[in-house]
Amino acid sequence: MNSYAYYNGQFGKREDILIPLSDRSIFFGDAVYDAAIGSYDRIHWESEHIDRFLLNANRLGIKHTFKKNELSSLLREIAVKSMLDCYFLYFQLSRKTLCRVHSGLDASSSLLVTLDPIKIEESPSPLKLITAEDLRYSYCDIKTVNLLPAVLLATEAEAKGCDEAVFVKNGIVTECTKSNISILNRGRIITHPKSNRILPGIAREHLLDKCRKIGIKVLERPFTKEELLTADEILVTSTTKLCRRAHTIDGKTVGGKEPALAEELCNLMYEDFANFCIK
């Protein structure tokens, strides 16, 4: 099976699932989501993804009736039905209503889940990045479906033959369109602190934990575009890409001064997923 989906009790192929036009994610982007990778009935970093998902739903006041263990069981059931051995899992909770009104105070919620096959590369090539001014609003720490600025920049990056775009806010690097970004400098890793300017990435947190375990000092502080361009190494982290080096920004060669250390961290992140798959 190439893809699988679920919506409020419906199970089936993506093209067979029907979503009502009253779903507020369509008109207002009134929804939160999360995404993970997995293998058969097991979801990588499952607990952290579900915790973030439920926290964001609560922050937006989206009402739901399931508990964490119930959502976990449902996601695993859907994964088993998909029969995919390695997949990208997307799950979304929207505030639904029967007519198009802005207020959603008394609305119930709808759960959408999709699964698609994915291949996680063991030794991917370094990334090419572009930079752009961060013009987003101040809710970047909530994983909502309002992704237009990220979509526009990701499209621009692809048009320029690049893999990702880096947001820069008043000279300060925040994050990428679908990833977190960190730099290695003089044996330290530097990454933007958690705030309403960035998504608290799960892969980001695992990378920082690995740095601490092997003796790399972790600095969670803002860093500038100039620091980015002159860093010893640049690391991009996400749920699906795990950890990747970047070697080009805006057409200029960057990093490359600590390749062994950067590769060690990338390999540690990949090994975690590989070990997860064979358990």
Where is each model-derived feature located?
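Short, internal active-site loops enriched in acidic
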Residues: 94-99
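Ordered, amphipathic secondary-structure segments that act as subunit-interaction surfaces
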Residues: 75, 80-93
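Helix-start/capping segments and mature chain N-termini
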Residues: 1-80, 102-279
